[in-house]
């Protein structure tokens, strides 16, 4: 399993109900862009990848694998803001923060942790969202 290939597949995922997404965004006065979907794909996909790696290698080794690939922040199971920023092709982590805030407004439960060991982790989904 190549982590780079897994991440590419995660980002390319397109099996959302976009109409429902747009409707919820409209109801909440949120202007969506592809960055929202890329971030959501990564948050969900990396979480799934972490669980898959944990089953195969154990949680500690799975975390280290994702940390070595600069996906997880150091000594953490939170996805690095730097990693996310690069995938939405923006220069600042504020762009990530703003999109995460929008996803939270749409009902996604996303934990945020600041500092060098911080990042983001998805922990729950809105009723309307079918994962």
From Swiss-Prot:
Name the InterPro entries on file: HTH_11, WH-like_DNA-bd_sf
Q: Which domain of life is it from?
A: Archaea
The molecule here is called: Uncharacterized protein MJ1005
The organism named in the record is: Methanocaldococcus jannaschii (strain ATCC 43067 / DSM 2661 / JAL-1 / JCM 10045 / NBRC 100440) (Methanococcus jannaschii)
């Amino acid at each position: 399993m190549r982590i780079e290939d897994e991440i590419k597949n995660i980002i390319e995922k397109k099996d959302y109900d976009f109409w429902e997404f747009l409707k919820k965004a409209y109801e909440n006065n949120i202007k969506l862009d592809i960055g929202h979907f890329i971030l959501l794909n990564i948050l969900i996909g990396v979480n799934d990848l972490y669980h898959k790696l944990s089953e195969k290698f154990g949680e500690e080794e799975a975390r280290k694998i994702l940390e070595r690939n600069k996906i997880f922040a150091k000594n953490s199971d939170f996805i690095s803001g730097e990693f996310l920023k690069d995938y939405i092709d923006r220069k600042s982590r504020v762009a990530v923060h703003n999109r995460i805030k929008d996803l939270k407004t749409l009902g996604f439960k996303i934990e945020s942790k600041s500092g060098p060991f911080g990042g983001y982790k998805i922990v729950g989904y809105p009723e309307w969202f079918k994962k």
